[in-house]
């Protein structure tokens, strides 16, 4: 089984860290391939970045479908950019890290908080929660003003900031689990879970395991209505 993890931004450093973490959690024999577009924003930190990145993400999926299709796709950005569009392009399972993590939290806790990056993404995070049908379980959204690459620039300081925000979510907001709201936070879930005493869900790990399960069960993306292949038309 091969899962293609696509980091929609153009940061190869982030792609490498995502690939390493993903390979550690999947079953023996599952291969993680990880790529990022060569063009587009270096990081995705808002709607404008996401709009630019989505086009190049779709190009990567189209190339993979032509040249070397995987068994499943994972979109490794917590905004789940282009998720529905990619589901239209392929029959294979496509998993967004946000949808996977939000749903995963429901199996281990009655409530969850998302600890993410910048205040500007709050509206989009609420929309992701609504789309997942999880609004009634959301305790809070914590946005401690961390950039996507904060953990690559000053890991210790970023981790302390993340830990404090998650601690507040548990102690003050009633969160019984924490969803890490950025692929750049990969690799810290277990440490935080041990310190906080609640499940902390890494979205990349969750998405890869969900994708793996979908392939193992033989499930494909339905083409009944919503995710039908795009109709043929002229593109200028």
UniProtKB/Swiss-Prot annotation:
- What pH behaviour does activity show? Optimum pH is 8.5.
User: Which Gene3D superfamilies does the record match to this protein?
Assistant: 3.40.50.12500
Single GO biological process annotation from the record: amino acid biosynthetic process
Per the UniProt entry, how does temperature affect activity?
Optimum temperature is 55 degrees Celsius.
What does it catalyze? a D-5-monosubstituted hydantoin = a L-5-monosubstituted hydantoin; D-5-benzylhydantoin = L-5-benzylhydantoin
Q: What's a single GO MF annotation on this record?
A: amino-acid racemase activity
Q: What class of enzyme is it?
A: isomerase
Activity regulation field: Completely inhibited by HgCl(2) and iodoacetamide. Stimulated by dithiothreitol.
Q: Which keywords accompany this UniProt record?
A: Amino-acid biosynthesis, Coiled coil, Isomerase
UniProt xrefs under Pfam families: Asp_Glu_race
Q: Coiled-coil stretches, from where to where? A: none
Q: Which domain of life is it from?
A: Bacteria
- List its EC numbers: 5.1.99.5
Site (Seems to be responsible for L-isomers recognition and racemization): give the residues: 182
| InterPro entries tied to this protein | Asp/Glu/hydantoin_racemase, Hydantoin_racemase-like, Iso_Racemase_Enz_sf
Q: Annotated site (Seems to be responsible for recognition and proton retrieval of D-isomers), which positions?
A: 77
Give the transmembrane ranges: none
As for family, the record states: Belongs to the HyuE racemase family.
- What function does the entry list? Involved in the asymmetric conversion of racemic 5-substituted hydantoins to the corresponding L-amino acids. Catalyzes the racemization via enolization of D- and L-5-monosubstituted hydantoins. It shows preference for hydantoins with arylalkyl side chains such as 5-benzylhydantoin (BH) and, to a lesser extent, 5-(3-indolylmethylene)hydantoin (IMH).
User: Subunit structure, briefly?
Assistant: Homohexamer, homoheptamer or homooctamer.
Q: Which PANTHER family does the UniProt record give? A: PROTEIN DCG1
Protein name per Swiss-Prot or TrEMBL: Hydantoin racemase
Q: Which organism is it from?
A: Paenarthrobacter aurescens (Arthrobacter aurescens)
